[in-house]
């Protein structure tokens, strides 16, 4: 098997790399297109091949968004369109690996989900208003900004992607106006001299309190993680003195929340929607060069920070090659960002105080506990970790119905050594350690490009799950824990209307019922993105960085202190429809989307049907898209050809509803 895999890898290497340019260069051809494909193995041999491809991703210009954990489990791979994609498909097909298109043009997905009219929030601005997909047909929006606690002075654009300077300004403003419970902590600086800052939230006490650590954005491209961490900050501060349980949290514990551990990488991903920039994973450490197989040298920069901690470092799930996305660094704690975490948690202020360590990532909807360096390897207190994790995902699901799975990273994804969560458990002996992979679930195609409409719902539900971890810490220390969702939490299920819950449950029931019976067609297929469910269960600044920090501070001070709260946003459930075909390689996926794109928020939406059907008021018989009538008009057979998709999205128009049949 090894010989065959090596032969296949050599063939891929020869085909894909002749004449290619090193993946590390920061000069990109804006005409290049990248696709996201799903691949799944059918035996151990093909699974081994996929994993070997990931370890050698830099050789083949591949970007693994998600690794396969087992046979039939899908991997998500971003690959350059054209020759690279065709040849990779041929090789994988020969190795008995199923390949299917997920996103034909990743850059268009980026612009559709993350484009904004505010250049201060997102570097590449709004270039694709017409690319927006149709919203779900709802009489009222699912997104409720009232779930974001109001702070009189400190404002942050929740529901949008903002700059690192905006994050720091927001935290500093909170410290200024809420000094009794909030204090800025600077744990270190990056390669480029940016400060790594977080917020300590806790009421003053005469004794040393137990602590909870939360971090986000250790991987540059995982934007939703920092937004969620900032929401944690907002809720703990805004609800202090209002919500009895949160007041108890802040009085009893100290929370240390660092929203962005990788500011250099995060800011780099904001500079362009080009996939190789937006999907950058590592930090921005200086270039390292290695001899090239084709002569000369390959020079690449960046280290995967979540492979750089001292826990079975460099053993599995990482690479010695600087050009790899999972490069673990020259040595353990080689990076200023990881040293900053280590050194701060070893200070007298923090040593032996931390009872919970939560690190936020995306994506897959997973609640992960140690250990992740190898399969079926667990800490001694695994029972308590599982019990709390189960409570957390159950509580999370009661908010919007989003289902998470739980397990170790090795058991649910694939083995990966050198992670911060495993290090916190083994080296710091933290009791409750969790890595949370946020929305979307693994089966959906948006991946890291989470639509802005889903940011607040993601944060709201994750905070509810996080509260179970805090309750466990309080119980561990014999303190009064939260009395739960049913007893008055401000973000409890009670804040969600019955209509909203019915809509969420209806969507999930339809999608879940169709998932098991879906089949692959050789004709054009529709692939849909929804929010729904899983089917299962030393911190020193390097020399010559002062000028970078001065420039960063100048940028910070030049912007206004507070940003107004954004207006009511559209519905959170925003499926993205992608068209793909096995016969036409360069098909323009925007053909139908352009015809049915939505207008601006201030515009009244129209229907392709003559009137708004009264049956839409019946949650058992309704269309979920504006475009159902348009699709049927342009293809009379679409209901039969795309039955699974159309049954879920256009039940009324296609006359799939039992209530429709009874009336007619």
UniProtKB/Swiss-Prot annotation:
Subcellular location(s) of the protein: Cytoplasmic vesicle; Secreted
Keywords carried by this UniProt record: Carboxypeptidase, Cytoplasmic vesicle, Disulfide bond, Hydrolase, Metal-binding, Metalloprotease, Protease, Secreted, Signal, Zinc, Zymogen
Compositional bias (Pro residues): 564-573
Gene knockout outcome: RNAi-mediated knockdown results in a slightly shorter and stouter body.
Record-linked Pfam families: Peptidase_M14, Propep_M14, ShK
Cystine bridges: 621-657, 628-650, 639-654
Residues at the catalytic site: 437
Keyword Signal among UniProt keywords: yes
Keyword Disulfide bond: yes
Major enzyme class: hydrolase
One GO cellular component term: extracellular space
Entry function: May play a role in processing or organization of cuticle collagen proteins, including rol-6 and col-19.
Protein name: Putative carboxypeptidase suro-1
UniProt source species: Caenorhabditis elegans
Organism phylogeny: Eukaryota, Metazoa, Ecdysozoa, Nematoda, Chromadorea
Gene name tied to this protein: suro-1
